[in-house]
Amino acid sequence: MTRTIVESKTKTAIIGFDQPFCVIGERINPTGRKILAEELERGDFSRVEADAIAQVAAGANILDVNSGAVFSNKMAEDPRYADNNFVEPMLMPEMIKRVQAVTDCPICIDSSVPGALENGLAACEGRPLLNSVTGEEERLELGLPLVKKYNVPVVAISNDDTGISEDPDVRFAVAKKIVERAADFGIPAYDIVVDPLVMPIGAMATAGHQVFTLVRRLREELGVNTTCGASNISFGLPNRHGINNAFLPMAMGAGMTSAIMNPVALPVSPAKVAEKRAELAALGLVLPEDMDDEALVQLFGMGSTLPRPGKEMEAIRAANFLFDRDPHGGDWIKFNKVAPKAGQEGRGRAGRTGGRRRG
């Protein structure tokens, strides 16, 4: 069985055909997150640490750390801060150190900048996953020597110098090329995790079918583990969670062994809570004085004010159970166990009083 080993200093994550689905948490990424990028520019890593903790609590097995930021406020003093090749090699090791300080979860180092990858590898304790190489000649020549030097597994993305092909046969050929080139460096297939590239189903009706077919071929013909950006499948569609929740178990059934995704259901913001309170007040509804924000959002099905596992995690855990990758359903039962209410700890059926006894 193909098994890809990713390790922190004290913990091991296994990506494999016979293993529970591996969730690679994607939240630590300043791309498209303006507030996080601004905080990183100020040297504030508190959100990075909070995201790491929340994702592990939600069930992430590996944490992706992406350093893709530019420091716009510092550009005036030094134009190099507008260049990822300048910023990321400095930023990546600090982000990794902060994550390692608050969790022992294995890390996936995510950057397209070779200097950031190498500095991240130097800062990482254990055996991280490197994200990524592509079929582009320049990326292969820069990335594969790092993989060999540090003896780490790598994500191989199925695009090359011609871009991303909509033809699944072309994407398979690119993946095969990467596996073969890696072998030339002495890198085994079990240390390569192929991303066959998930297309948005809203733009390409065959996107789901393509991925399932590709994953089967990659497993059967190349013997490699696979991953994907799970939320890509639902991009641009309403109720994205509904699509994601169906896609992930189907991908698992086809043989996909991991996904880069957000395991956390984002908390309801204070602004949303205030909006709901105002809406109820306008309707003349009077809430109990002692009803806090969490009780309010639970009552009206808004979610939670606290980070918690997302619905996608529920779908993955159910699929692990159904595919016999969760022995005796232990993880499923633990995940769905309801915490006892205050004052009821230790009370079970035998603790009830006043019931009729059978003679």
What are these regions (language model features)?
Residues M1-V193, M199-G359:
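Domain-level signal for soluble alpha/beta catalytic cores
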